[in-house]
Amino acid sequence: MTVRVNLPKSGMGIEEGTLARWLKAEGEHVEKGEVIVEVETAKAIQEVTAPATGKLTKILVAAGETALVNTQIAVIEED
């Protein structure tokens, strides 16, 4: 099953974030709850965790790019 990884809301008034650093690469195995990317907002650095266990099949927003809250940033194919 394909699982979307969306940029979560990090606080009141925060509508976007810049993907600072991917901790996992495409094709790597991820565990549910594992931190996969760090996102920089106007207020802090936020860690985004994998919503499912499986393979990170596609990164849709590269490090250094900005995305709106709830935008899909990656795809995980569940084991």
Predicted regions and their residues:
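Mobile cofactor-carrier "swinging-arm" domains
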Residues: 1-79
